[in-house]
């Protein structure tokens, strides 16, 4: 049974690598944010705004526990999910966790072009964006680093790099993957 949780900051490549890894392993991929949006028929941003952070994080935890019961699956979490309640401990208990570690400057270059799709980043100037990323990573790193594995996901700029990363992840997780 395979149950892999990909964690990391927004823009780390959780969805990109998760889809590619799941395809390689011939198992389903679940993006926790998409799962929540599908269930509640609202975007994560709308749910966050309407319910407030505490209520949203409780909902997120419940949905994490729901998908955490699925077998033979790759799951990407929201960037904040590992940092609340006992979510990291839970994921480590029921599956294999991988923290996609990305240099803040690489995250900056990825998020800079995707600012409009991420409400929390809209309106931030370049220097503010980099500071925001660095500060958020400092707060979240202690949670992310509780993952079973840490994988440097700096190089995901084209199909070849994604494929290389998938093969490296397969090797890294070899003890847990028998496909």
From Swiss-Prot:
Listed GO CC annotations: cytosol
Cofactor note: Binds 1 Mg(2+) ion per subunit.
Residues binding ATP, per UniProt: 11-16, 118
Pathway assignment: Metabolic intermediate biosynthesis; chorismate biosynthesis; chorismate from D-erythrose 4-phosphate and phosphoenolpyruvate: step 5/7
Catalytic reaction annotation: shikimate + ATP = 3-phosphoshikimate + ADP + H(+)
UniProt cross-references to Gene3D superfamilies, sorted A to Z: P-loop containing nucleotide triphosphate hydrolases
Subcellular location per the Swiss-Prot or TrEMBL entry: Cytoplasm
E.C. numbers: 2.7.1.71
UniProt KW keywords: Amino-acid biosynthesis, Aromatic amino acid biosynthesis, ATP-binding, Cytoplasm, Kinase, Magnesium, Metal-binding, Nucleotide-binding, Transferase
UniProt-listed GO biological process terms: amino acid biosynthetic process; aromatic amino acid family biosynthetic process; chorismate biosynthetic process
Enzyme class: transferase
Keyword Disulfide bond: no
UniProt-annotated binding residues for substrate: 33, 57, 79, 140
UniProt-annotated binding residues for Mg(2+): 15
Principal place of residence: cytoplasm
SUPFAM superfamilies: P-loop containing nucleoside triphosphate hydrolases (SSF52540)
Alphabetized HAMAP family for the sequence: Shikimate_kinase (MF_00109)
NCBIfam families (UniProt xref): PRK13949.1 (NF010555)
Sequence similarity: Belongs to the shikimate kinase family.
Protein name: Shikimate kinase
Organism phylogeny: Bacteria, Pseudomonadati, Bacteroidota, Bacteroidia, Bacteroidales
């Amino acid at each position: 049974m395979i149950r892999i949780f990909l964690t990391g900051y927004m823009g780390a490549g959780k969805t990109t690598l998760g889809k590619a890894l799941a395809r390689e392993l011939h198992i389903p991929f679940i993006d926790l944010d998409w799962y929540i949006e599908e269930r509640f028929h609202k975007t994560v941003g709308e749910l966050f705004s309407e319910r407030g952070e505490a209520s949203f994080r409780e909902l997120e935890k419940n949905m994490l526990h729901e998908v955490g019961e699925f077998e033979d699956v790759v799951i990407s979490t929201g960037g904040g999910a590992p940092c609340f309640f006992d979510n990291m401990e839970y994921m480590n208990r029921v599956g294999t966790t991988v923290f996609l570690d990305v240099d803040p400057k690489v995250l900056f270059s990825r998020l800079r072009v995707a600012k409009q799709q991420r409400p929390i980043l809209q309106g931030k100037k370049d220097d503010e964006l980099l500071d925001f990323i660095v500060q958020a990573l400092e707060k979240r790193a202690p949670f992310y680093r509780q993952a079973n594995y840490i994988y440097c996901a700096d190089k995901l700029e084209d199909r070849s790099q994604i494929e290389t990363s998938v093969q490296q992840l397969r090797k890294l997780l070899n003890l847990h993957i028998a496909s």
